[in-house]
A protein has these predicted regions:
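Conserved core architecture of multi-subunit DNA-directed RNA polymerases
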Residues: 1-230
């Protein structure tokens, strides 16, 4: 059998890895990378995978004799692909819950602006991302900032929660201190449940400048991507 000589085989130039960028997948990126939207809980009908079901063949085939329509390979060679489900309501990614609670203490619960002045603390931009995040969180979560605008020029004046607390596995509440002059009935209203929908709305309003100043990235790790929508 004829074989190619070493001289005729082109040598592929290897690339040098200079870094790895970790990121949070945005909902749009998940949809773009997905090969199928899963809309049915069914798996098989007449021994064939249901299109749009949990075993949709576009995600790869499992049985001999079937060919994956995504890459044209059989069950032994296809690497498999992921699909996506459009959630009826958003939910928290449990692994980001602590960070979500910290971000809620850094931005206004009404207008989503950062609670500290970026101009007064612009030296933070010289810090590495993680160091900057810890620095900004320490400043923005200070008990001395009771209203949006106490430490910035363009705040909305909204009274900020004293605490962001978690109950159970992933239920968040904003808690305000008792305010003089309120009746006992009104004081009970000083606790507000922060549903994933509410948190998502707050995080979507955070500007890219504020996201960057906190040490996150508008391109790789926006806070609203920490709430699962897809």
């Amino acid at each position: 059998m004829a074989t190619k000589s070493k001289e005729t085989i082109p040598k592929k130039k290897s690339s040098k890895i200079i870094g790895i960028q970790f990121s949070i997948l945005s909902p749009d990126e998940i949809r773009k990378s997905s090969v199928a939207e899963i809309t049915s809980r069914d798996t098989y009908i007449n021994n064939k995978p249901v299109i749009g079901g949990l075993f949709d063949s576009r995600m790869g085939v499992l049985e001999p004799g079937l060919i994956c329509p995504t890459d044209g390979l059989d069950y032994m060679e296809t690497p498999g692909y992921f699909g996506h489900i459009e959630l009826a309501r958003p939910v928290f990614y449990i692994q980001y819950l602590t960070t979500i609670m910290k971000i809620l203490r850094c931005v206004c619960i009404k207008c989503s602006k950062l609670k500290i002045s970026k101009e007064n603390y612009k030296q933070a931009l010289k810090m590495a991302s993680e160091e900057r995040w810890n620095y900004v969180f320490k400043l923005a979560s200070s008990s001395s900032i009771t209203r949006c605008g106490d430490d910035s020029e363009d705040g909305c004046g909204c009274l900020q929660p004293k605490k962001i607390k978690k109950e159970g596995l992933a239920t968040l509440f904003a808690e305000w201190d008792n305010i003089n002059g309120l009746s006992e009935e009104d004081k009970e209203k000083l606790n507000m449940k922060l549903t994933p929908e509410i948190v998502l709305k707050i995080f979507r309003r955070i500007s890219d400048d504020d996201v960057n100043f906190m040490g996150f990235s508008p391109v790789f790790s926006r806070p609203d991507w920490m709430v699962c929508q897809v």
